[in-house]
């Protein structure tokens, strides 16, 4: 009796020990499962307790650039728990000057004891008159290579057949080889030991030879590109085989780490074993519960003729027929003949009843579905968020209307293409006519993803908080559609871009018009930066976002990229967004956004107003593609007359244009801290207009001008003054800006 109890205790202890050993091989629950785009599968891991503890070769490194490294140097691109891992190996290259040779050193790798080269690789040489060699070292050394010959540019046929490119057809390294090296050499003349074969014509199209390992099917030779510089590719994908330990399945015995519903297989390329899920299971076989049952009935991997007869079971499936049916040899369920007629009648009656019921409830169901869909779109498009933010910002009482989907369709004639006013990065703008014949502009977002929805809600909130005569007025929005719609006032005269560069308008903007437009835009930006309840940076100021009404009054539009700056901050770090040609270079390189970014963009707009040329034009010469550099260079070299638009330049306004050009140059200085604030820019431009008006008035009434300006004005202290200072004009302009509209 005592003997039997002892045997029982030994068995219990053995089972408990076995489970304990297996449990110690399982990773922690908090292990990192991804590095960049690579999923990390156990037994691999990137920290203690996350990889197989019996072998440090499975300890990977995730560097700052989100790259996964093997042995700390080899980048991993994919891990498969079937015993394969994809990595990137460097190429070997050796370049030659004409008639001279540059000696290179073979490139070598030493893999860990758990890894070896897969036979699913090719050893490839690209070059003319060269020989490549790959050698592996282990219990049995192995070498392979190939020869490539050519004295002229090979035909571009995509073949790697020994002319400009060669590859090993049978790549099978010896068992348990984990160290290898490879390289290439140029063929020499056996008579004088020179590189005569490498003549001038070959040097022109093949200055270098390249030897590299690459996974089969991952490289296609192109003689027109690869012989020159291998398309600048320096690393190639290579397949490695891996296994657990250095024992066979039988030798490892109960210490194997194969989980439940998996089997152990001896490695075919080196010592050790791998685990695979049993048939009917899928998952990671190295986890204790990693192999999960595959539901063949759902995954459609069964052979039952009717999916309804499929019944899933653990590790497989069965085809079972319902009561009254028999399973035939083709795995189909059939019913005896005498029962078919009765079933047919029952089916017909049932179908008629269902059709009648469907007709009765169709209308109600359709209405319910339509209402639910509109409600779903409303929430999906941020309706709840918009109402909450409008209320939280104290904007619930503004004249802001929520439009219906039907109203938007009628207003745009079903979103007819003829109603499209313009298209941009944030969406499409349609011309709409409301039931009261009010003409509006309707902006339809391009995509209905979360980022676009946030930008849409952001634009609504920004526009709702701006009350300025030179900012496009928001009227409302529609959130019942798949993509959100924004409704704002319709500006009849197109954009400033159309008037300066487009063919839609036969426009001839005078200097007075252009100066006034510049003053209005500058004043608007100064208001947004300094006088709005929360400072706002537009972030996309350009002529295409400045609308003109019938009186050529400027209206700043498209606030989809704008940013609200907290009162306690002067700048924000954001993802760079804007339009090339107008984008602040300092913001582009640092990601730091502040009001000086709008100042730069406005400076480009002012240059367009002065020159009549586009901010970025690839049709201009290389030195003048970017208007800013072209304009600043002309200003500094006293060549301003070459770039100023002929429609605005004359002797009467030359000084004004020179001053405006100087302001534009100041706005586009490379360093943001050297640019003026928008308030200062607006004041300077306003001073230009005041000075222009003063000169015009003095020319018309010279006697009065002499009396007021040339004479003396009595001061409060009894002294006299004979001039009106620029600072006084500037102060008046600043006061006008800060007051707002």
UniProtKB/Swiss-Prot annotation:
Active-site residues, record numbering mapped to chain: 540 (proton acceptor)
Domain of life of the organism encoding this protein: Eukaryota
Glycan-linked positions: 37, 59, 78, 100, 103, 141, 192, 199, 232, 246, 261, 266, 303, 328
EC numbers on record: 2.7.11.-
Signal peptide: 1-23
Domain EGF-like: 245-292, 293-334
Annotated Pfam families: EGF_CA, GUB_WAK_bind, PK_Tyr_Ser-Thr
Topology feature Cytoplasmic, residues: 364-741
Residues annotated for ATP binding in this entry: 421-429, 443
Description of what induces expression: Induced by INA.
Entry-linked InterPro entries: EGF-like_Ca-bd_dom, EGF-like_dom, EGF-type_Asp/Asn_hydroxyl_site, EGF_Ca-bd_CS, Kinase-like_dom_sf, NOTCH1_EGF-like, Prot_kinase_dom, Ser-Thr/Tyr_kinase_cat_dom
Spans through the membrane: 343-363
GO biological process: cell surface receptor signaling pathway
Catalytic activity: L-seryl-[protein] + ATP = O-phospho-L-seryl-[protein] + ADP + H(+); L-threonyl-[protein] + ATP = O-phospho-L-threonyl-[protein] + ADP + H(+)
Name used for this protein in its record: Wall-associated receptor kinase 3
The organism of origin for this protein: Arabidopsis thaliana (Mouse-ear cress)
Lineage: Eukaryota, Viridiplantae, Streptophyta, Embryophyta, Tracheophyta
